[in-house]
Structures are given as structure tokens and as C-alpha cells.
Amino acid sequence: MRSATPGPGSGPSEGRGARSRGPAGAAHPAAAGEPAADAEDGTGRGPLRYAAAAFVFAVGMAGTTLPTPLYGLYRQELGFGELMVTVVFAVYAVGVIAALLVAGDYSDKLGRRPVLLAALLLSAASAGCFLLEGGLPLLFCGRLLSGFAAGLLSGAATAAVLELAPGGSRGFAATAANMGGLGCGPLLAGVLAQYAPRPLTLPFATHLVLLAAAGALTLALPETARPPRPRPRLRPRGMEVPRQVRPVFVPAALACFTGFAVFGLFTAVSPGFMSATLHIGNLAVSGAVVFSVFCASLLGQSASARTGAPVALPLGCLGLVVGMVQVGLSLLLGSLVLLVTGAVTGGIGQGLAFRSAMTTVSRRAPEEHRGGTISALFVVAYLGISLPVVGVGALSTGLGLRNAGLVFSACVVALASGVGAWLWRTRKSAAAAPAPVD
């Protein structure tokens, strides 16, 4: 099973019989055999339908990162500190993990379109919470709903894009749609907030318009899944890491944790770094820096497919080390160039590490435990995107944001170095390990 994963988003496997994923692409076994799109190759697929599915995916994921350049404005308006910014951000991960564990395979059981529509409605409700500007409770509610939406959307949309894309580009198509959406969210919000009126309203109103268009396209898409008849009971999915998978799961999960921690740093507090340390208050620039991280991750994931997981995984850790050294230097020297360079290098490292970790774990896990194992991997990854960044916020109350960022950078460098060295020493045995017989 070859995994091609987008970032906090999805990770498809390629080939016929695409499977429904969890929030960031956890592969869940299909409930009813071959998807309808494969059975109707002449009518189910096509460039317009594939483009429509990719647009739906990108628009939905853009909502999860849309608030990134705006947190500083909320902080000024509502009077809370950097710690609360990171807590508001991290609530998103709670929603994603809950959706992953409860509803990761619902699109197999109910069909792609119903789950996509539910995800878009949740995303619209999230945007509505931000539009109301009702203080911290609505910000928390908006972020939680955004996490639920991402959890539902990534599984169903990844599968839909895979099933509608041309055969040779399925994995990259889903990855590009996911990462493109995640990157365009802060870029769109930053540009609108900087150069248009009503900076806390217009980005979310624009997103609602895009969501309406995505909903209309979803209704026009062919149903690519064949839900079983009668429909099975909807029940939560479990997590399980079989004993034979644990030797590769532990380092792969640590690499995912570290890579997602870098994502969390940039999507939660990099605008604060730029304002407080680099004295750059342009929100469009802040959004562009975050955009560069996700674009770089896409490049890293593409390179991972060509390099091979046993080599790409330790190389990804090396990229995370170099990237965070550059971020630390940017904070010490007040250099935007070093911050952008660190964003790109760290993003490439995250992409290499994440996709190769997915590939390694999914290949080693037996078929009957694959969904639960990958679910566990994503729980670790989303803990990485939330817990460390809350630590940065907590440290900033006593040390200041600059010093908290330096401590974070040092911790990531230490963890990624240790995991990378471990993976490099064991790469030959990992490459030689046989895949389970399904």
C-alpha cells in the first residue's frame, strides 16, 4: 500500500479501489469493494469532475488555516495573550482527533457526497462563529467545528479525488488539493485583512461564498462509493498498533509528531513572531510565510515517493533539524529571510517525514489492523500540532515569545536529531522487512 499524504490533512493510497481516509488521510478499508468511479470509467471520471472534487477539498481545508494571520487582531480586540492564542488554535486538533476516531470511515458506509456536504456545513458553521465576533467562546466553538469539518472532509474528499483523478496522478492530486487548501487559507486571509476593509469579517464571508460554490459542486459530483445495503450501524473506530508493527511505528510516530509540531508553530504563532521579534506587521506577509510551509511540504511529499521511505524518513528529520535551526537563528538575528528559509526547509522535512512514515506504517501493518494503526499514527500527529504549540504559549508568558520560540526550536532539533539518527541506523532492516501477507 503506497501512501501519499497531504499535511494536517490527508494521505491517500494510490491505485484502484481507493479507500476512505481519516482526517489526514488515514486509510480505512473500503466497506463495499471497488468504488463506483472505477466501475464507470467512461462517465465517473473526467478532468472537470476531478477538478471539482479537488476544489471542494481545497476550499474545505482552507477554512482550517484561515484564522492564522488574524490571531493577533483577535488578541488586540479581546485582550488575551499568546497562551490563549495557542489554546484557541489547539482546540482544532481536538475536533480532528474526535472525527478521526468516531467517523473516519463514514464515507464508506454513507457515500462520499453526504459526508462531504456535512463537512462543508460544519465549515460554514465555523465561519459563522468567527463572523459573529462574540468573544472567546465563539472562537473556541469555531475552531472545534473546523476540526470536525476537517476530520470528515479529509477522509471523504481524499477518497473522492482519488476515485475521480486520472490514474497516473491520483496520489499527487489528493495531496496537492489538501496542501493547496491549507496554504491558501492564511494567504487569502492575510491579503484580505491587510488590504481590504473589515479584516475580521471579509475573510470568513469570502470563505462562506467559496463553501457555497463547493456545496453546489458536491451535489453535481457523481457518487464514487458503493455504500453497502443495508447500511451498517455507524460506530466509532478504534486504534490498535499490533506488536509486530511497533518497532517501525514508534520512530515513525515520533517523526510525525515533530513534523506536525513545526506546522503548529507556523500556523499558530509565526505571525506573533513576525510582529514581536521581526517587527513585521503586514498580515499578507504573515500569510505568505505560512503558505510557503505547506507548499514546501507538498514538495517534500512528492520527493518522498521517489526517494523511498527508508531513506526519506531520516532525511525528513534532517530537514526538520536544519529548518528549526534556521528559525531559531531568525529569532536571534531578526531576519525574515532566515524565517522564510526555515519555513521552506522545515516544510520539506515535514513532507518527507510524514509521507514516508505513512508508507512505512501502512506497509508493515496487517490488513485487518491497518485502519486502526494509521488512526493511531494520526492521533500522535495531531497531538504534535497542538500540545507543543500550547507549550510555546505557556512559556511566552514568562520568557517572552522570542525566548519561547528558541526553546521550542531547540526541543524540535533535539527530538528530530535523535529520531533521525535512530531511523538512519535501522534503515536497512526497515527496507528488508517483508510486508504482511493480507
Language model features by range: what are they?
Residues 312-355:
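C-terminal transmembrane helical hairpin of 12-TM major facilitator-type secondary transporters
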Residues 142-178:
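Cytoplasmic helix-loop-helix junction between adjacent transmembrane helices
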Residues 358-403, 408:
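A late C-terminal transmembrane helix in Major Facilitator Superfamily
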Residues 97-136:
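Conserved MFS/SLC helix-loop-helix module at the cytosolic interface between two early adjacent transmembrane helices
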Residues 79, 111, 132-137, 197, ...:
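Helix-breaking motifs and short loop linkers at transmembrane-helix boundaries and internal kinks
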Residues 137-146, 337-345:
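Paired small-residue
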Residues 286-309, 323:
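Transmembrane alpha-helices of Major Facilitator/SLC transporters
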Residues 167, 172-219:
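Helix-loop-helix hairpin linking two adjacent transmembrane segments in secondary transporters
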